[in-house]
Amino acid sequence: MNVTPTSAIIKEFAWAAEAIAEMQAATNLERYEKAWLDYLHYLDRGWNKLEKHLAGISQKNLSQARQTRKSDALLSYLMHARNVDEHTIRQVVVKRPGSLKITGGPGGGTIQRGVFSGDGQVSNIVYEGALDIEFVPERMEIMGVTDRGVFYDLPKSHLNVPLNSLIPHELARLALDHYNSSLNAC
């Protein structure tokens, strides 16, 4: 079988996409974290191969791709998170507990009684007024990382678009889409 430079890149990015699917299908946070770490690995390997491919095509495109990877908050963060996972014993994600948020609507509300379980189920609730009840399940979120003595905070944007999530698989999809479009532009 003849392996082309682009087929090697496509393979790594396909494995990164599989890791995203594994995160989304994970039945526990340990499996989710493993899929996240796999994703970081495959994304970085795909980038390394893309970088070598670009070097053989256009120095201008290579320079732009490297600059974007260094200056974009999300892409830079992912690079350093992978480095931290690969070369240290520090964590790159944090487990957040589930929570239940109850807010009163216009005019407020009063709960007289009810049962709120840890899985977000609400039963036998008696209340007056307007209430909004929101359950946020236990989840993994990215965390700031220190790579080679430099702290990299949580990314706030990707390609100048604000990020409104710290959920790994949501951020992973954005970065993978960017790298795939870079490959398609070759």
Locate each region found by the language model.
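Core of folded catalytic or high-affinity ligand/protein-binding domains
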Residues: 38-45, 49
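Short, Lys/Arg-rich flexible segments
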Residues: 53
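Acidic, Ser/Thr/Gly/Pro-rich intrinsically disordered interaction regions
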Residues: 1-37, 58-186
